[in-house]
Amino acid sequence: MDINTAKEALLKRSNAFQERYFTAYGQLVLRVNEETYISSRENLRLSKLTEKDFDLFDINTGDIGRIFSSRDDINAIVFICTEAAVRFSKENQVMRPALDDLAQIIGPDVTVCPDGTARTLLKALRNRRGCFIQGSGIIAVGDTIEEAIAGARILEKSAEAEIYSGKLNGLQYLDPTTAQELHKYYDGSYSKVNQKEKVDFISSGAEEFQLRNRIIDCGKDMSRSELVQGSWGNISLRLNPDTMLITPSGMDYFSIRTEDIVRMNIHDLKYGMQRKPSSEYRLHAALYRRYPECNAIIHTHSNGISAFAAAHAGFRISEPPMDQLIGDMHCSEYRTPGTDELCDSIMEAIEGSHACIIANHGAIFYGNDLDVTLAIANAVESRACNLLGFGQRAEEEEA
């Protein structure tokens, strides 16, 4: 990787901080090669970064250089300072996972470091992909900048859930064994799926080609709307009475190509020699089988709804037309992601509605049209944020 490619990657991925929920100040860092790394200057507003904000450093420079020199598995580092992260880090010494994506991508627990020295951070990052720095914010690391940014946003989301959980009678934490198993699964399986650079294109008609591209566009829109972090969440469309098209597992929404979308039979769940489908394919297929009017499904990991998910709480929707389109948001019982048991739990919770909250996880929405379903997911997320009283700060600052 050369410096221009690295700078382009950081600028491109800085659009993950769209300020729907919070304004993030901080630093994006990427290893260029064995001798250098590129970094934005400290404490800049990440959504406003420009080409002039980056500098090249020797790999041995500063605490960042010492982290890179000590850990060859770390190629990207993200520092973010937000109100929720600072507040949580001042009041706590450790974070327990109440969201399973935190357990998976970051670790079974998260340390609050007393300082930001390389020695302290390296200790906290042992077998972890992130931590808090007391009174300063978040550091997240990864093999790629996409993974590090996703980790930082998941830590921020979890800090928000901790702070606002008092309005929801507290959080329901994952037990330590479950959290450890989820992290082990991510390291051993999820993070390694669909690593093949390209797959062969499956012959399809014009309608299927169009639907595949609609899924891709929807994924990018979900990311821009901050309804998901990184590769989390999933999307599907009904192709015909017996077949669905679904997003692949573990792939960033901005890297998915037309041929990466997986065609699957909703009855026998066969998909042949394609990408591995989203781990929630059983749930999507079950919804298509049960509800003939279901033509589109979206699964999100958005901040507001995630706070309710972490508390095993639902909420009422009484405002028209949303009350008719969705119904109340009930919360399912917690079950391990990607299992038949999770599918059964969600199918029970979604009965009589077109959406539900998934305990310790996120939310699922279905409808007749993909664009309408995405609009509903955005509207319900805004409703969750309003009920909690957060997510308006960035808009107020711009006003």
Residue map of PLM features:
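Glycine-rich flexible loops
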Residues: 1-399
